[in-house]
């Protein structure tokens, strides 16, 4: 499905909600519930395949899951490619095209080297990917400035770096910026204002702003990350515990 349709759904204040999937069947459930786009969660995909997150899964396996999803659903798919699996921009673009992906997330922590990329380094990667894909791919630039931030004060301290990176990534051609795991509504609102009118992706977290607040803040896209996978896993675990106790799991 086309990147054009995915791009059109990024409207500040009317956010695209993405309940992240991890295989073809969970993707089907997303579509059956009426959501217009499927997104993958790299952590959930990796866990379903028996790996830890952080590019422990091979690119072949990850892109195989993506291809299975696009074959199973008739809505656009955006793929979480972590930091790129050590692939060149051309290789990454080719693999996404082969999987018929309409979009991708690319994070600025280099998982292969275990370090944060510099602003210029990550902007260059994004520009290279966009040069190869053009408008055929919606690039969501994930910004890791808030990961590990200690409460609202820590998030506020991380805000200038996040804004600097967002502006550089947008200048490099990113279609959307994703300051992952911001829990402070005030800080997230300031981030949205600083990069306006660019689309901003927010994470829907149990201890963060709810859907109504995220909409009010003007974000254009909301990801659940591993949220659905964790819920599914918890339900299965509870059913197994009941069965082990000799009671009905149903």
Regions found by a protein language model. Name each.
Residues 26-29, 79, 84-96, 206-220:
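Catalytic cores of alpha/beta
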Residues 17-23, 38-40, 77-81, 104-106, ...:
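Hydrophobic faces of well-ordered beta-strands that scaffold small-molecule active sites
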Residues 37-63, 83, 87, 105-122, ...:
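Glycine-rich, proline-tolerant flexible connector loops at the mouths of alpha/beta enzymes
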Residues 1-20, 24-32, 125-131, 137, ...:
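N-terminal amphipathic alpha-helix/helix-capping segment at the start of soluble metabolic enzymes
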Residues 200-250:
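C-terminal alpha-helical cap/extension of soluble enzyme domains
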Residues 101-165, 244-250:
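Conserved anion-binding
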Residues 34-38, 45, 97-102, 135, ...:
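Glycine-enriched alpha-helix->loop->beta-strand junction motifs that scaffold or abut catalytic
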Residues 3-4, 51-79, 116-141, 183-209, ...:
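Alpha-helix-loop-beta-strand connector modules within alpha/beta enzyme cores
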């Amino acid at each position: 499905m086309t990147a054009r349709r995915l791009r059109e759904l990024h409207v500040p204040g009317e956010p695209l909600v993405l309940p992240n999937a991890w295989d073809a069947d969970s993707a089907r459930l997303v579509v059956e519930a009426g959501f217009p786009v499927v997104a993958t969660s790299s952590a959930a995909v990796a866990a379903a395949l028996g790996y830890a997150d952080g590019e422990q899964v091979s690119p072949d396996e990850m892109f195989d899951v993506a291809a299975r999803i696009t074959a199973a659903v008739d809505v656009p798919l955006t793929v979480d490619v972590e930091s790129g699996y050590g692939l060149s921009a051309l290789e990454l673009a080719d693999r996404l095209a082969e999987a018929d992906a309409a979009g991708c997330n690319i994070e600025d922590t280099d998982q292969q080297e275990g370090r944060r990329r510099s602003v210029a380094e990550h902007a260059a990667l994004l520009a290279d990917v966009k040069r190869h894909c053009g408008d055929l791919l919606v690039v969501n630039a994930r910004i890791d400035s808030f990961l590990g931030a200690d409460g609202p004060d820590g998030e506020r301290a991380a805000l200038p770096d996040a804004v600097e990176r967002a502006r550089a990534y947008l200048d490099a051609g990113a279609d959307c910026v994703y300051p992952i795991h911001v829990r402070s509504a005030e800080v997230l609102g300031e981030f949205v204002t600083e990069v306006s009118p660019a689309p901003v992706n927010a994470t829907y977290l149990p201890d963060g702003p709810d859907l109504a607040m995220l909409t009010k803040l003007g974000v254009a896209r909301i990801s659940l990350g591993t949220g659905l996978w964790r819920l599914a896993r918890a339900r299965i675990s509870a059913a197994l515990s009941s069965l082990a106790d000799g009671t009905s799991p149903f």
